[in-house]
From Swiss-Prot:
One of its GO terms (cellular component) is plasma membrane. Belongs to the ATPase B chain family. The keyword Ligase does not apply. Its main location: membrane. CDD domains: ATP-synt_Fo_b. Keywords: ATP synthesis, Cell membrane, CF(0), Hydrogen ion transport, Ion transport, Membrane, Transmembrane, Transmembrane helix, Transport. GO terms for molecular function: proton-transporting ATP synthase activity, rotational mechanism; proton-transporting ATPase activity, rotational mechanism. It is a single-pass membrane protein. Gene3D superfamilies: 6.10.250.1580. The chain crosses the membrane at residues 7-27. F-type ATPases have 2 components, F(1) - the catalytic core - and F(0) - the membrane proton channel. F(1) has five subunits: alpha(3), beta(3), gamma(1), delta(1), epsilon(1). F(0) has three main subunits: a(1), b(2) and c(10-14). The alpha and beta chains form an alternating ring which encloses part of the gamma chain. F(1) is attached to F(0) by a central stalk formed by the gamma and epsilon chains, while a peripheral stalk is formed by the delta and b chains. This is ATP synthase subunit b. It is found in: Cell membrane. The lineage of its organism: Bacteria, Bacillati, Bacillota, Clostridia, Thermoanaerobacterales.
Length: 159
């Protein structure tokens, strides 16, 4: 076996030339592509993190708005219930006042009707008494006698 130094040197030169060409043509562009890809991924991750933070901020803002809206709804409902209760109480009070007024009017009307009926009854009793007295006395009673007897009878009845 014979070792040829010239082949060895040419092989070595070819190897380094190939290595140099590969470094220029492949290694640097591949390295640059990898570096660009790495930067792109990092930028995408940063954008995603910012988007995540923004989404969380917006979600917190919306949660706050929803909580505020719910609280406002509770307040509106409570106010409406309070107003309805006040209106109910006012309606009941008005109805009670009207009922009491109607009852008082009815009592007054009944009292007036009773008084009127009593007056008419007294008058009728007086007339009947005069007629009875006239029959007993067997004489005609004049209008003046009639009025006098009615007045006397009514005075006695009142006592």
């Amino acid at each position: 076996m014979h070792f040829d130094w010239s082949d060895f040197i040419w092989t070595l030169i070819n190897f380094f030339v190939l290595l140099f060409i590969l470094k220029i043509l492949l290694y640097k562009p591949v390295l640059k592509t990898i570096e660009d890809r790495k930067k792109s991924i990092e930028e995408s991750l940063e954008k995603a993190a910012k988007a995540q933070e923004e989404a969380e901020r917006i979600k917190a803002e919306y949660d706050g708005m929803i909580a505020k809206a719910r609280e406002e709804a509770r307040e509106i409902i409570a106010k409406a219930q309070k107003t309805a209760q006040a209106e109910k109480e006012e309606i009941i009070a008005t109805a009670q006042r009207e009922a009491q007024s109607l009852l008082a009017d009815a009592k007054a009307t009944i009292a007036q009707e009773k008084e009127k009926a009593l007056r008419e009854l007294r008058q009728e009793i007086g007339n009947l008494a005069v007629l009875a007295a006239g029959k007993i006395l067997n004489r005609a009673v004049t209008l003046e006698d009639h009025q006098k007897l009615v007045d006397e009878f009514l005075n006695e009845v009142k006592m």
